[in-house]
Design a protein with these regions (language model features):
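Conserved N-terminal phosphate-binding loop of PLP-dependent enzymes in the Aspartate aminotransferase
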Residues: 1-151
Length: 151
């Protein structure tokens, strides 16, 4: 039983697959892995037996409140969130490594994507953990020397 399917444009497929066969070769990598199957079943149980939609709504509210503090920072172009995804978009992408290093040093795993500093959290996250993640993202931006200088 396949656990997932993937659809992509030819341009994206060409970028991530160097196969001469002409197809994306990563589709079946974890297909029917016993551990993945067990996790999938547990996930289905969680979806059936919990108030996950309410949890996601609460996460979105917290992201909205906490990301507001990033809007005033010089390096920040915009902030946005939807559901359990929170994003800070920077004006430039040259600070990604500094931001990641700061976050990891402060026990938060963030992997910037170009100018985007983002977090996609589990809908079972504790409120204090979510607030710590967002605060650390913002503190990481504040820690960059240029952030403390005037425009």
């Amino acid at each position: 039983m396949t656990m997932a399917a993937m659809i992509t444009s030819k341009n994206v497929s060409d970028l991530i697959s160097n196969s001469d066969i002409g197809v994306l070769m990563h589709g079946p990598t974890f297909m029917a892995n016993p551990l993945a199957c067990s996790v999938a079943n547990a996930s289905i149980d969680l979806l059936r037996d919990t108030s996950w939609q309410e949890n996601v709504k609460n996460i979105e509210t917290i992201f909205t409140q906490e990301l507001e503090f990033a809007k005033e920072l010089n390096l920040v172009k915009s902030v946005r969130n939807i559901g359990a995804i929170g994003v800070i978009e920077l004006k430039d992408d040259c600070y990604a490594q500094e931001i990641q290093d700061y976050c990891v040093k402060n026990a938060v795993w963030i992997r910037p994507f170009g100018k985007l500093i983002y977090s996609i959290v589990a809908y079972t996250i504790k409120e204090e953990d979510l607030r710590k993640i967002v605060k650390t993202m913002i503190d990481a931006i504040k820690s960059i020397k240029i952030e403390n200088e005037k425009k």
